[in-house]
Curated annotation (Swiss-Prot):
Known function: V region of the variable domain of immunoglobulin light chains that participates in the antigen recognition. Immunoglobulins, also known as antibodies, are membrane-bound or secreted glycoproteins produced by B lymphocytes. In the recognition phase of humoral immunity, the membrane-bound immunoglobulins serve as receptors which, upon binding of a specific antigen, trigger the clonal expansion and differentiation of B lymphocytes into immunoglobulins-secreting plasma cells.
Protein localization: Secreted; Cell membrane
Self-association and partners: Immunoglobulins are composed of two identical heavy chains and two identical light chains; disulfide-linked.
Disulfide bonding pattern of the chain: C41-C106
Region annotation Framework-2: where it falls in the sequence: 51-67
Domain Ig-like residue range list: 20-115
Region called Complementarity-determining-2, residue ranges: 68-70
Spans annotated as Framework-3: 71-106
Annotated signal peptide: 1-19
UniProt keyword annotation of Signal present: yes
Alphabetical list of Pfam families matching this protein: V-set (PF07686)
Spans annotated as Complementarity-determining-3: 107-115
Species annotation: Homo sapiens (Human)
Name the record gives this protein: Immunoglobulin lambda variable 3-10
Amino acid sequence: MAWTPLLLPLLTFCTVSEASYELTQPPSVSVSPGQTARITCSGDALPKKYAYWYQQKSGQAPVLVIYEDSKRPSGIPERFSGSSSGTMATLTISGAQVEDEADYYCYSTDSSGNH
């Protein structure tokens, strides 16, 4: 699992090794309220696995915002979307809001739940 905090205006870098492969999220980028934030996650296993994205606000449990690459759970605002192509998955927040400030975790698994 890799993570990136969306700090309006900062996204931070992290690389995490999981089950013999790595998921990598990019260096920091600036995001102002109302702008579009794109957080990428790359890994050699992603073409064969689904990407899941979690949002974790300070002091709170993680919340699933995108599953199976691009599906949005009920209750998650439409400004959150996901896509995946080749070895890269992307979480897009269109018109980022102040309340979107959080850590964002990229996680991958196949349909059977294998990491």
